[in-house]
């Protein structure tokens, strides 16, 4: 079902509506959509900003952290007055000020096995803007089992990556069969991150989400996009479904209940 647009919306979204790939029907589809963004930090901030601006009707923003001053160099939905405020609520307040068409739900929690089904329920797309491997594997697994497209992004210093995981394509475990050992991957507090880098990658994630919602263009399904800000290069590397994947391969599991996302994210099929 798509929504009819009133005069104010026809004006607000006029630059979309004039394009054949969107039009009034596509804009109505965006306004009828529900997107969950997990993480309201570096990647989540630009994704939230643009998904709200383009008129995604329902946004769920999930984050258990609070705004710190060191976040403000890159997390563009938060400002100095938000320091100490839960990121989910700060991002939600930004959305409310940006676009009254968007109903935004802040969820001040870390996604885990106990709440992930409730978090993603009813969503058309999930955007993974998290910063840790247990959450990435958890979102991959539950979205695969629930049949929900998932847009992944990650950043490191001057480099970023993104891919889109659709229900009938390869999953995150096909791409990265094993998570790194805990503590072996440094975070941005240790290595630093170029302030504009998450903006680029987060906007790519928002673009992928929009394409999925509009059913237009070619998604990054089965392709991992690499971005190097220092060389200003983009490269895509194809990947395929792993027939032995424990989630999407033959004979794989069909539930997250027996998977330990705290220790290793590994799945035993024995």
UniProtKB/Swiss-Prot annotation:
Reactions catalysed: [small archaeal modifier protein]-C-terminal Gly-Gly + ATP + H(+) = [small archaeal modifier protein]-C-terminal Gly-Gly-AMP + diphosphate
Protein name: SAMP-activating enzyme E1
Function noted in UniProt: Likely activates multiple ubiquitin-like SAMPs for protein conjugation as well as for sulfur transfer, via ATP-dependent adenylation at their C-terminus. In fact, it is required for the formation of all three SAMP1-, SAMP2- and SAMP3-protein conjugates, and for molybdenum cofactor (MoCo) biosynthesis and thiolation of tRNAs.
Organism: Haloferax volcanii (strain ATCC 29605 / DSM 3757 / JCM 8879 / NBRC 14742 / NCIMB 2012 / VKM B-1768 / DS2)
Residues involved in Zn(2+) binding: 171, 174, 245, 248
List of residues binding ATP: 42, 63, 70-74, 87, 131-132
InterPro entries: ThiF/MoeB/HesA (IPR045886), ThiF_NAD_FAD-bd (IPR000594), Ubiquitin-activating_enz (IPR035985)
Keyword Nuclease: no
Matches recorded under Gene3D superfamilies: NAD(P)-binding Rossmann-like Domain
GO cellular component: cytosol
PTM statement from Swiss-Prot or TrEMBL: Sampylated at Lys-113 with the archaeal ubiquitin-like protein SAMP2. Also sampylated with SAMP1.
Keywords for this protein: ATP-binding, Isopeptide bond, Metal-binding, Nucleotide-binding, Nucleotidyltransferase, Thioester bond, Transferase, Ubl conjugation, Zinc
Protein family per UniProt: Belongs to the HesA/MoeB/ThiF family.
Co-factor(s): Zn(2+)
Phenotype of gene-disrupted mutants: Cells lacking this gene are deficient in sampylation, i.e. SAMP-protein conjugates. Moreover, they do not grow anaerobically with DMSO and do not show DMSO reductase activity, but their growth in the presence of oxygen is not affected; however, they are retarded in aerobic growth at 50 degrees Celsius. The lysine tRNAs of the mutant strain appear to be nonthiolated.
Subunit details: Interacts with NcsA.
Keyword Transferase attached: yes
Cross-link type Glycyl lysine isopeptide (Lys-Gly) (interchain with G-Cter in SAMP2), residue numbers: 113
Active site: 188 (glycyl thioester intermediate)
EC number: 2.7.7.-
MF GO annotations: ATP binding; metal ion binding; nucleotidyltransferase activity; sulfotransferase activity; thiosulfate-cyanide sulfurtransferase activity; ubiquitin-like modifier activating enzyme activity
Record-linked SUPFAM superfamilies: Activating enzymes of the ubiquitin-like proteins (SSF69572)
Record text on cofactor binding: Binds 1 zinc ion per subunit.
